[in-house]
Regions:
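Exported/extracytosolic protein signature
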Residues: 1-345
Length: 345
């Protein structure tokens, strides 16, 4: 109204746009004075002050990533990147740090301050151990921190998992120190070298099976490590006793395979075959006798007996024959075959 009579009032309005400095300051305080005219004179009011407090929300966000897709060997490195962002509404100051349960993280200490929305990038590397391969993955947890005044501001936890490429493997190398055999009862000595050729540790039970070694003979393994680390090996031995069938066959061929465990899963080796040749010695001995002491006239008969013995180490087969420069010899054609030590008359 005009004039503004005593006791009357008017209401004025204004808006103010908050700045980052206002948030940093913690409040907006402003002072106002009103004026009007009385004739030619200016009438000035008292000063009035209003303070509006800021809601200061210091905040820090961590985003952890890796460029390493997986790992498969001891000594492999995993590279990590940590993006640390001021997600609050007030500046933060150093020291900037990232705590990681697997590695030491390097963070830049600039800019100072770290204003809202700004970020820094920290880095770290981790070297893979055998335990990491055995575990199947590297899982690590990180947290970032910065300062707001005297207070420490802590970020969220962020976890990154990098999987292992586990390659359980077992290699069997079978050998013998026996070059050959030629008699029933000969023994063939075998050795079995079982190596963990994979990249993770293996556990018992360990076993070597051989198609020629059975009760009462067994494959005997000594000094078994537990676990069997990659590159480690153990040695087993076995003895095989030659049979007539082995001599007849011309060789002993046997196939072996090793097994171990990866947790609840069996790990099977290659099959390895060793062939030991027989020294086959076919032989025949003739023992010729007569029951006729002498003769004294034409027409007397002389009786001969021919003992034909298989004196070798392999069976012989018909036709059986004896050649005699004086007579024709009749030989039975059984048994067939004529085994070592057997004879016909």
């Amino acid at each position: 109204p005009n004039p503004l009579v005593p006791g009357a009032f008017i209401t004025c309005t204004a808006t103010y746009v908050v700045t980052q400095a206002d948030i940093n300051a913690g409040s907006v305080t402003n002072i106002a004075t009103a004026t009007a005219k009385h004739g030619n004179d200016t009438v000035t009011s008292n000063q009035d002050t209003v303070t509006v407090p800021a809601v200061q929300l210091p905040g820090l966000t961590l985003d952890k990533t890796t460029t390493t897709a997986n790992y498969d060997s001891v000594g492999d490195t995993i590279s990590y990147s940590y993006k640390v962002t001021n997600s609050g509404n007030v500046p933060l100051t150093p020291p900037y740090a990232v705590s990681d349960n697997k590695t030491t993280v390097i963070c830049p200490q600039t800019p100072n301050p770290l204003v809202p929305g700004a970020f820094i990038t920290c880095t770290a590397t981790y070297t893979v151990t055998q335990a990491d391969l055995n575990a199947g993955s590297v899982v690590n947890i990180a947290t970032a921190s910065a300062k707001y005044g005297n207070d420490t501001v802590t970020s969220n936890q962020d976890t990154v998992t990098v999987p292992a490429l586990q390659g359980p493997a077992l290699t069997l190398d079978k050998d013998t120190s026996t070059p050959d055999y030629d008699a029933v009862g000969d023994t063939i000595q075998y050795t079995y070298k079982v190596t963990n050729s994979g990249n993770i540790s293996l556990q018992p039970p360990y076993a070597v099976t051989d198609n020629k070694i059975g009760a009462p003979n067994t494959v005997v393994c000594q000094q078994l490590p537990s676990p069997l680390l990659p590159g480690q090996f153990f040695t087993c031995t076995a003895t095989y006793t030659v049979t007539q069938a082995d001599i007849n066959a011309g060789s002993v061929v046997n196939v072996a395979q090793a097994t171990a465990m990866n947790g609840a899963n069996p790990v099977t080796s290659n099959t390895d075959t060793v062939t030991v040749p027989a020294v086959q010695l076919p032989g025949l001995s003739l023992d010729k006798t007569t029951t006729t002491g002498n003769y004294d006239q034409v027409g007397d008969t002389i009786s001969y007996s021919y003992k034909v013995t298989n004196s070798g180490n392999v069976p012989l087969t018909p036709p059986y024959a004896v050649s005699d420069n004086k007579t024709t010899v009749n030989c039975p054609q059984t048994p067939n075959p004529l085994n070592p030590g057997q004879f016909i008359t």
